[in-house]
């Protein structure tokens, strides 16, 4: 029986691209309907697409396999942004008000919009996490309703290189696969954090570390707010490649790492120079050499994690400790090594998400956590809705039932031809649905750019106001009003009143100055 209500998620990993289809059940659990994957080491590096054509081919193959299992067409999917270059930077936006004013949500939105327009060459802002607001001399998370003449908005911007998102969108377009509307700026590490961290951990302060194949992602939370995010371009594959340098095939190197590798070797542990690690007589390596290789590279990764924790400024505020996840977190003795290098004693391993899973069993080693988190974040039905086509009843055969030949309807039409037409209609309906979705996204992008342009005009007007160039300021406001953006009307009107008031005061001041100068001249 074909599935008609399901969510599809795709994870773009450095070793494989994985697709999953599932259904959210009334009891809150998730039923897995289908999973499949394709090797991605030849098209994705450090979590970022570098070969668009090969990625497109893999995506097309994954969708076909999922559709075959589901016996239904997939209209859109959920996909997250991750990989190298993804990180956070801080920014502060300041507003000096002419008089004591009650802070409104509109003013907060204006600060947020200004922050989003902060120029970052070569990068784009994917998400914004407000940290706090300084109202007068006080710091608060929710300033709406407070009286003040000065406000600062402190924001944490999540950024990535422009090409990261562009390449994802381009590959999905080439594969004629729609991306769910609420998945446009889905940041995979944040979704993972929601699926793994408890409210208590996020409140008390913790560091979440996702050990991947090519990258290691670090997130720091405190008081339920993301405080820092960074991606280190090192992962489990780096250890494997170091072992490969000993003239060992990559597949065997990976097996040696998993079977014999240790992230931490006790200083008191005696070395046996003659001890050898081998795999069914296929390959072998001196035990001490393997341990040295694995420990050295692991320490490099852990030292980078420790450095990011220090850079965040929250190294002394992680009461809930560290939560480790990801496929590469299964390294033997990782807990001891992590504690030694980061000085964090409280460590928890998250081998699976908090969601109850039904249906197919997934590996409980942390490698599917991000994929499950993306699936759980999905809200829209990903099944492609295709208009139902009524198939005419074929003519009943008269006489021998074993007569072979073409079937025709009562109207004399070929049943085979009708089936072909139905398939063509389905394909056209799918293309029309994708085209409509693309048009909607383009319209939304145009509207977003209009809002940015309007905000720029407001900022220019604010600048001219400060310079007492009131005529120029009012011209900018007039242009902004002509754009007819409802949510900006309030800000335009408020600023217009301020400028007109200042212009009038300035005019009166000039008149008094002229009279005073005339009196002085007469004297």
Predicted feature residues:
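Nucleotide/phosphate-binding catalytic cleft detector across ATP-hydrolyzing
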Residues: 1-16, 20-76, 81-206, 263, ...
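Residue-level signature of catalytic and energy-coupling elements of molecular machines
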Residues: 9-10, 19, 79, 172, ...
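A short acidic Gly-Thr/Ser loop motif
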Residues: 10-16, 81-82, 201, 208-215, ...
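Phosphate-binding glycine-rich/basic clefts of nucleotide- and phosphate-handling proteins
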Residues: 68-69, 83-84, 157, 163-173, ...
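Short glycine-rich phosphate-binding loop at a beta-alpha junction
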Residues: 72-83, 312-327
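ATP-binding/phosphotransfer module of carbohydrate and carboxylate kinases, centering on a glycine-rich
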Residues: 312-315, 333-348, 381
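Glycine-rich phosphate-binding/hydrolytic loop that grips phosphoryl groups
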Residues: 350-403
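Boundary/linker segments of alpha-helical solenoid repeat arrays
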Residues: 485-495
């Amino acid at each position: 029986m074909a599935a008609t209500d399901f969510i599809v998620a795709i994870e773009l990993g450095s070793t494989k691209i994985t697709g999953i289809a599932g259904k959210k059940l009334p009891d809150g659990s998730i039923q897995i309907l289908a999973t499949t994957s394709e090797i991605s080491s030849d098209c994705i590096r450090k979590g970022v697409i570098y070969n668009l054509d090969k990625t497109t081919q893999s995506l097309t193959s994954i969708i076909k396999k999922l559709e075959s299992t589901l016996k239904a067409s997939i209209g859109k999917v959920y996909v997250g942004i991750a990989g190298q270059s993804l990180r956070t930077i801080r920014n502060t936006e300041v507003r000096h008000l002419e008089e004591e004013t009650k802070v409104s949500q509109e003013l907060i939105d204006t600060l947020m919009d200004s922050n989003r327009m902060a120029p970052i060459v070569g990068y784009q802002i994917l998400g914004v996490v407000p940290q706090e607001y300084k109202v007068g001399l006080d710091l608060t998370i929710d300033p709406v309703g407070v009286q003040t003449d000065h406000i600062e908005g402190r924001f944490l911007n999540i950024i990535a290189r422009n090409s990261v998102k562009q390449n994802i969108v381009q590959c999905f377009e080439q594969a004629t696969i729609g991306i769910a509307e609420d998945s446009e700026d889905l940041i995979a590490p944040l979704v993972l954090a929601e699926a793994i961290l408890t409210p208590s951990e996020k409140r008390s302060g913790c560091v979440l570390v996702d050990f991947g194949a090519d990258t290691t992602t670090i997130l720091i939370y405190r008081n339920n707010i993301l405080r820092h995010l960074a991606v280190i371009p090192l992962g489990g594959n780096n250890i494997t490649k170091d072992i490969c340098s000993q003239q060992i095939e990559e597949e065997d190197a990976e097996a040696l790492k998993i079977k014999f590798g240790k992230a931490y070797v006790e200083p008191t542990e005696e070395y046996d120079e003659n001890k050898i690690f081998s795999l069914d007589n296929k390959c072998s390596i001196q035990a001490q050499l393997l341990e040295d290789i694995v420990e050295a590279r692991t320490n490099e990764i852990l030292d980078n994690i420790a450095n990011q924790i220090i850079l965040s400024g929250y190294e002394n505020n992680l009461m809930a400790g560290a939560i480790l996840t990801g496929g590469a977190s299964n390294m033997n003795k990782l807990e001891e090594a992590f504690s030694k290098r980061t000085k964090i004693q409280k460590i928890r391993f998250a081998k699976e998400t908090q969601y109850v899973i039904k249906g197919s069993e997934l590996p409980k080693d942390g490698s599917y956590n991000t994929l499950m988190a993306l699936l759980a974040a999905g809200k829209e039905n990903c099944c492609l809705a295709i208009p139902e086509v009524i198939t005419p009843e074929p003519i009943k055969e008269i006489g021998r039932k074993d007569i072979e030949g073409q079937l025709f309807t009562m109207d004399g039409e070929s049943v085979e031809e009708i089936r072909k037409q139905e398939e063509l209609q389905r394909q056209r309906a799918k293309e029309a649905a994708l085209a409509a979705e693309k048009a909607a996204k383009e319209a939304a992008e145009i509207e977003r750019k209009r809002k940015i342009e309007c905000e720029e005009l407001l900022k220019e007007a604010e600048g001219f106001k400060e310079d007492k160039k009131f005529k120029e300021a009012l011209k900018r406001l007039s242009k902004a009003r002509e754009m007819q953006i409802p949510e900006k009307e309030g800000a335009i009107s408020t600023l217009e009143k301020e400028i007109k008031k200042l212009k009038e005061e300035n005019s009166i001041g000039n008149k008094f100055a002229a009279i005073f100068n005339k009196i002085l001249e007469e004297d």
